[in-house]
């Protein structure tokens, strides 16, 4: 049902974009309406599950407890920061690029950002699929099964990250052509370097996502929050400005790879320490 609702929303968006923009001539207003109709369609389909004989969810009366709300917010805040940091990083990069090179560099970054959005969406999907399983087996105290799913998630992220990196290196020209229909040579040259350098971050971004979803699943929101904060806020600002000072435009494209690599190192230390703690606790019990 979740897949049907999600895919249906996307299909409705595509169809209504064509109808509202080209058939009705509504322009950007039509595109906006089509975009609004997409999640609305998904919501309607999900709501129909209430009347399905196979339903496993139902509405119940409950009292709102501040302690429960606080716990929910503490666990989910790292995911919120993950989403919000993307907008912050884009804003920061645009300011730096505008002052450093100009509008051509911003156009190049727009192409990189679109590619990054696709990669992040897939990484998010992997994490959201793994988190319920991690939470379940952590709650049941089955640490061996938990480690099995952590290993599987790690391998999945590792393979996906390498594939995205490889695609970015091999098909750079084809990716640029999708956005550079006018054949601007300067834009193509800057974007080619930008994609190939920025794509190094894909090797570590997914692994950091794994850390965020893992620590959220095992009720360690502070660790998840630390990872989100490091990669999205606290590291990117100093790293970006230091690399720009040292390397100019090249430093902009290398900023995220450096940030993701450093964050991964710190996340790995935290994960190994917590894994050893779970092993010791398991041995005692």
Task: Describe the function of each predicted region.
Residues 4-11, 33, 37, 77, ...:
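Hydrophobic residues within alpha-helical transmembrane segments
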Residues 12, 23-76, 134-200, 243-285:
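Short alpha-helical transmembrane segments in multi-pass integral membrane proteins
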Residues 1-2, 108-172, 205-224:
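Small-residue-rich hydrophobic transmembrane alpha-helices
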Residues 3-7, 45-48, 61-92, 97, ...:
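Hydrophobic faces of transmembrane alpha-helices in multi-pass small-molecule transporters and flippases
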Residues 10, 83, 87-91, 100, ...:
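Recurrent gating helices in multi-pass secondary carriers
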Residues 11-15, 88, 122, 126, ...:
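Residue positions within transmembrane alpha-helices of multi-pass solute transporters
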Residues 16-17, 46, 77, 89, ...:
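Hydrophobic/aromatic residues in alpha-helical transmembrane segments
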Residues 19-26, 87-114, 118, 136, ...:
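Helix-terminus/linker motif at the lipid-water interface of multi-pass membrane proteins
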């Amino acid at each position: 049902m979740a897949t049907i609702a999600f895919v249906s929303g996307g299909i409705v968006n595509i169809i209504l974009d064509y109808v509202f923009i080209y058939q009705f001539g509504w322009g950007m207003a039509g595109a906006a309406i089509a975009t609004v109709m997409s999640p609305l369609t998904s919501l309607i389909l999900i709501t129909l599950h209430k009347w399905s004989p196979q339903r496993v969810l139902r509405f119940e009366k409950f009292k709102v407890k501040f302690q429960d709300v606080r716990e929910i917010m503490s666990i989910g805040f790292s995911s919120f920061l993950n989403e919000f940091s993307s907008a912050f990083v884009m804003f920061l990069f645009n300011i730096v690029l505008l002052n450093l090179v100009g509008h051509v560099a911003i156009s190049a970054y727009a192409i990189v950002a679109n590619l990054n959005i696709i990669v992040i969406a897939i990484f998010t999907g992997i994490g959201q699929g793994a988190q319920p399983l991690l939470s379940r087996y952590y709650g049941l105290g089955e640490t061996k099964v938990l480690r099995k799913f952590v290993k599987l998630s790690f391998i999945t992220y590792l393979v996906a990250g390498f594939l995205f990196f490889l695609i970015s290196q091999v098909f750079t020209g084809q990716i640029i052509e999708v956005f550079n229909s006018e054949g601007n040579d300067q834009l193509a040259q800057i974007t080619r370097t930008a994609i190939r350098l920025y794509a190094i971050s894909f090797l570590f971004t997914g692994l950091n996502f794994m850390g965020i979803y893992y620590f959220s699943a095992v009720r360690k929101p502070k660790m998840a929050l630390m990872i989100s904060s490091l990669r999205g806020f606290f590291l990117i600002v100093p790293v970006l400005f230091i690399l720009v000072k040292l390397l100019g435009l090249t430093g902009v494209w290398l900023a995220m790879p450096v940030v993701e690599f450093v964050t991964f190192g710190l996340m790995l230390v935290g994960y190994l320490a917590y894994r050893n703690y779970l092993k010791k606790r398991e041995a005692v019990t």
